[in-house]
């Protein structure tokens, strides 16, 4: 048996094929892992204005996003259906800080304390566009939501419940 293995028989081809497949799988897994970050890592590594949702057709991923929204505890302030409560309704036509992907991602990851005009983020250009009677600042969820992909799915659900952002309206 050792003779066949060392001599290049069918065993060496099988081992070579297995090593090739293992290498390909390992490389792919490493590549996929490199693409996924925590929300805080994504914010830190991406210049302002550059964050863009990988789910432009948000209706297809909305159900999964809603499950993640509930699991992260967003419903405690915004309500289970996004209609508000002690925080702003996600169904409003005007969102307090704006509705672009980059702003929504940073707002959820960093909280409103980092977006207020009086601090460094406010000096970077974040201004309130709407006003709501809210109980207090939104806490940051960048360390609660595990991956940037999970946060993008939550944003997809938020957009899906907002009349102004749905293609078919309300």
Residue ranges of predicted features:
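N-terminal secretory signal peptides that target proteins for export/translocation
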Residues: 1-10
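Electrostatic cytochrome c docking/interface patches
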Residues: 38-70
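Gly/Gly-Pro-rich "capping" loops immediately C-terminal to redox-active cysteine motifs
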Residues: 56, 66, 79, 83-117, ...
């Amino acid at each position: 048996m050792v003779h066949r293995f060392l001599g290049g028989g069918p065993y060496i081809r099988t081992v070579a094929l297995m090593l090739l497949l293992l290498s390909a799988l390992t490389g792919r897994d490493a590549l996929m892992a490199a693409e996924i970050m925590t929300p805080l890592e994504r914010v830190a590594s991406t210049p302002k204005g550059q964050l863009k949702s990988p789910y432009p057709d948000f209706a297809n991923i909305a159900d999964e996003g809603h499950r993640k929204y509930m699991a992260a505890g967003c419903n405690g302030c915004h309500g289970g259906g996004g209609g508000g409560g002690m925080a702003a309704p996600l169904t409003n036509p005007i969102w307090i800080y704006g509705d672009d992907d980059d702003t929504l991602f940073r707002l959820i990851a960093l909280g409103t304390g980092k977006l207020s005009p009086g601090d460094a983020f406010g000096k970077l250009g974040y201004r309130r566009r709407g006003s709501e009677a809210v109980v207090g600042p939104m806490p940051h969820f960048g360390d609660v939501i595990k991956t940037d992909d999970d946060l993008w799915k939550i944003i997809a659900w938020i957009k899906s419940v907002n009349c102004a952002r749905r293609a078919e309206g309300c």
